[in-house]
């Protein structure tokens, strides 16, 4: 059993569980052993959904009264890729020249290890007047259908309510504590299919080429910016992610063209407003091009679980910022940049902020974290916990 105040030993134990999403591979069981030894009551609900594998989750709680701090995270990791490219095996947790290597070291077993060690250090020195829980899923890197979103609902039905939540995602950029996340942009994806009529390129009058209309529709999506951004958010942006005709032949006019796109949007928009804006742009182009005759387009919106949000709880933000300053001497930047995370689910239950290790190597070959970064984050978490319950 690792020394529970040592984040490196905890992280090594977690990394040695090859928990490639959505497989548990012993990671939650290992974490449960640590938490049980510390005095937590641990439960392991399993959730399922159609066309997905069952996923194990963990909810651990200590305390019965007072403010309730939730720490949220995930033990599932992305695949390591070609093992030949790794300096050290990705599931051994080798420490070399001040760095600990392994898949999940940064995203985000390292954050979990630091919080567990931080809380163990707190318990050695004082009694917390409040409640602490860990909400840990094995389905964050995958479709995120059987993880945090269901675990929150399950816990709420059991009477759980939280004062605030800290998500241990790797938010830092260059050094531990330089950036915390106080919100996230929303995300929505669409598939536009432009229908034509297949034919021989030598006889275009017998066909209806979907590509000229597709190019005009694409231009309507990208030529005008959605907005200029806000005080707390970057400008919303639409990115094309795929264009395909399924036609490798040089002498065939394709039957259709398919365009995939994703939009990351700020708090100037709701999902419904944004969908209406895109639909209006496309309809205007179509009305000038045969108005529903071949070629024409169809638009499908992909269900999204990522709405835009901004945490405005000054007390929570200041408590974390002050903890960072007391350990590092620096004041963190409050940011909303980057992709989505499970904070998008938690924000419906309590104020939530995100803070963790530097993320330069996450999802990469030779993912690693420095020994110094682990100690710094553990110290900040410890200070934050103490101040939260002060």
Curated annotation (Swiss-Prot):
Alphabetized GO MF terms: acetylornithine deacetylase activity; cobalt ion binding; succinyl-diaminopimelate desuccinylase activity; zinc ion binding
Catalytic site positions: 76, 140 (proton acceptor)
Pathway: Amino-acid biosynthesis; L-lysine biosynthesis via DAP pathway; LL-2,6-diaminopimelate from (S)-tetrahydrodipicolinate (succinylase route): step 3/3
Keyword Repeat: no
Highest rank taxon of the organism: Bacteria
InterPro entries: ArgE/DapE, ArgE/DapE_CS, Bact_exopeptidase_dim_dom, DapE_proteobac, Peptidase_M20, Peptidase_M20_dimer, Peptidase_M20A
Annotated binding of Zn(2+) 2, by residue: 107, 141, 363
One matching Pfam family: M20_dimer
Catalytic reactions on record: N-succinyl-(2S,6S)-2,6-diaminopimelate + H2O = (2S,6S)-2,6-diaminopimelate + succinate
Cofactor: Zn(2+); Co(2+)
Family annotation (CDD domains): M20_DapE_proteobac
EC number(s) stated in the UniProt entry for this protein: 3.5.1.18
UniProt cofactor note: Binds 2 Zn(2+) or Co(2+) ions per subunit.
Keyword annotations of the record: Amino-acid biosynthesis, Cobalt, Diaminopimelate biosynthesis, Hydrolase, Lysine biosynthesis, Metal-binding, Zinc
Positions with a binding annotation for Zn(2+) 1: 74, 107, 169
A single BP term in Gene Ontology: L-arginine biosynthetic process
Function: Catalyzes the hydrolysis of N-succinyl-L,L-diaminopimelic acid (SDAP), forming succinate and LL-2,6-diaminopimelate (DAP), an intermediate involved in the bacterial biosynthesis of lysine and meso-diaminopimelic acid, an essential component of bacterial cell walls.
Binding partners and assembly: Homodimer.
Family: Belongs to the peptidase M20A family. DapE subfamily.
NCBIfam families, sorted: DapE-ArgE (TIGR01910), dapE_proteo (TIGR01246), PRK13009.1 (NF009557)
The protein's name: Succinyl-diaminopimelate desuccinylase
């Amino acid at each position: 059993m690792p020394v529970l105040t040592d984040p490196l030993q905890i992280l090594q134990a977690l990394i040695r569980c090859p928990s490639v999403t959505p497989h548990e591979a012993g990671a939650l069981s290992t974490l449960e052993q640590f938490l049980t030894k510390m005095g937590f009551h641990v439960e392991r609900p399993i959730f399922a959904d159609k066309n997905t594998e069952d996923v194990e989750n963990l909810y651990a709680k200590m305390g019965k009264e007072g403010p309730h701090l939730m720490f949220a995270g995930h033990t599932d990791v992305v695949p390591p890729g070609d093992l030949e490219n790794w300096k050290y095996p990705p599931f051994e947790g080798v420490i070399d020249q001040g760095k600990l290597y392994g898949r999940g070291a940064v995203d985000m077993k390292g954050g979990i290890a630091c919080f567990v060690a931080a809380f163990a250090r707190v318990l050695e020195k004082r009694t917390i007047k409040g409640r602490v829980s860990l909400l840990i899923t094995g389905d964050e890197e995958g479709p995120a259908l059987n993880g945090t979103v269901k675990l929150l609902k399950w816990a709420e039905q059991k009477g759980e309510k939280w004062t605030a939540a800290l998500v241990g995602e790797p938010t830092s950029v260059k050094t531990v504590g330089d950036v915390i996340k106080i919100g996230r942009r929303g995300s929505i994806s669409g598939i536009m299919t432009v229908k034509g009529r297949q034919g021989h390129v030598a006889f275009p009058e017998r066909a209806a080429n979907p590509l000229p209309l597709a190019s005009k529709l694409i231009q309507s999506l990208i030529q005008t910016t959605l907005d200029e951004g806000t005080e707390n958010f970057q400008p919303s942006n639409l990115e094309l992610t795929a264009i395909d005709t399924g036609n490798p032949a040089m002498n065939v006019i394709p039957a259709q063209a398919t365009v995939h796109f994703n939009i990351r949007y700020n708090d100037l928009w709701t999902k419904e407003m944004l969908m209406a804006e895109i639909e209006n742009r496309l309809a205007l182009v179509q009305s000038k091009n045969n108005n529903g005759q071949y070629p024409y387009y169809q638009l499908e919106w992909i269900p999204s679980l990522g709405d835009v949000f901004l945490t405005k709880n000054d007390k929570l933000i200041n408590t974390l910022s002050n903890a960072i300053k007391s350990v590092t001497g620096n004041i963190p930047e409050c940011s909303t940049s980057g992709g989505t995370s499970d904070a998008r689910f938690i924000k419906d239950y309590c104020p939530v902020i995100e803070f963790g290790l530097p993320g330069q190597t996450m999802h990469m070959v030779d993912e690693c974290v420095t020994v110094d970064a682990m100690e710094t984050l553990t110290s900040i978490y410890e200070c934050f916990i103490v101040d939260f319950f002060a």
